[in-house]
Swiss-Prot record:
It holds the Pfam family Pantoate_ligase. Belongs to the pantothenate synthetase family. This is Pantothenate synthetase. It comes from Azobacteroides pseudotrichonymphae genomovar. CFP2. Its main location: cytoplasm. Pathway: Cofactor biosynthesis; (R)-pantothenate biosynthesis; (R)-pantothenate from (R)-pantoate and beta-alanine: step 1/1. It is found in: Cytoplasm. InterPro entries: Pantoate_ligase, Pantoate_ligase_C, Rossmann-like_a/b/a_fold.
Length: 280
């Protein structure tokens, strides 16, 4: 596995691969890799001739400078994990200057998609995500790019970005990877105490149980019941829970509004904020 830090180096390495019409799989990450990332990389390796993982802590998607400063930067450990667990070919670990070399930063408009849920609570976040992903796509020019379904709103934004820019890349979602108790894997989980981590499995268990009440309870009743159940757990506070159309992210008010219904939730456990989702 080769570690590359400049755009020129990467594009030189990929030139021969493209000339031979070999498929390139790409997994963009911010590092602090866990088993969820590893599963994405394994899929990329299996489905493509060459697999590339980018490790880049993107400053434009952080609303809080302290969050940016505190975000773990563990390149050596990440590369070691990739070597141990996957047959990945390249790691692209550029500097901020390498990615944002030009001063003109493109602004993206995603309309309703970026004004609800995570977008409402983190203004500008998805524009920052789009800025870095669009740049990485133009540098790597992958055939396929892999994203986890845990960040469902982000996945929807990325699909829209590809359409807006008319990019020739296939976006491949990967099911959320979970702990045995149902907790969705996240880099933030390391901040949970053992007791909090054990209780955190109740988020997905509660969502799963709520799915059985589809068409029995009204949308509003199901949302309120789910919120109340989770808020009853010590140290838990639901920030939002909404049932949305999986394509448009529009809130639904009736089970007949769409056949593709996704329940999206954000929960604080103490000071740790977790997100999850489930399809109804």
């Amino acid at each position: 596995m080769e570690i590359i830090k400049t755009v020129v180096e990467l594009q030189t390495a990929l030139l021969k691969i493209r000339e031979q019409n070999k498929s390139i799989g790409f997994v963009p990450t911010m590092g602090a890799l866990h088993r969820g990332h590893i599963e994405l990389v394994k899929q990329s390796v299996v489905e493509n001739t060459i697999s590339i993982v980018s490790i880049f802590v993107n400053p434009t998607q952080f609303n809080d400078k302290n969050d940016l400063l505190k975000y773990p930067r563990t390149l050596n450990a990440d590369c070691k994990l990739l070597l141990q667990e996957t047959n990945n070919h390249f790691v692209f670990a550029p500097s901020v200057e390498e990615i944002y070399s030009e001063t003109n930063i493109q602004q993206f408009k995603f309309g309703h998609l970026e004004t609800v849920m995570e977008g409402k609570l983190r203004p500008g976040h998805f524009n920052g995500v789009a800025q870095v992903v669009s740049r990485l796509f133009k540098i790597v020019k992958p055939n396929c790019a892999y994203f986890g379904e845990k960040d469902f709103q982000q996945l929807t934004i990325i699909r829209t970005l590809v359409r807006l820019l008319n990019l020739n890349v296939k976006i491949i979602p990967h099911p959320t990877v979970r702990e045995p108790n149902g907790l969705a894997l996240s880099s933030r989980n390391i901040h949970l105490t053992p007791k909090q981590k054990k209780n955190a499995g109740m988020i997905f268990k509660t969502l799963s149980k709520s799915r059985k009440e589809k068409n029995i309870l009204s949308i509003q009743e199901l949302k309120q019941k789910t919120i109340n159940k989770i808020n009853c757990i010590p140290d838990f506070r639901v920030e939002y829970f909404d049932l949305v159309d999986g394509n448009t992210l529009q809130s639904i008010t009736d089970w007949k509004d769409t056949k593709y219904i996704v329940g999206c939730i954000a929960v604080y456990i103490g000071e740790v904020r977790l997100i999850d989702n489930i399809t109804y």
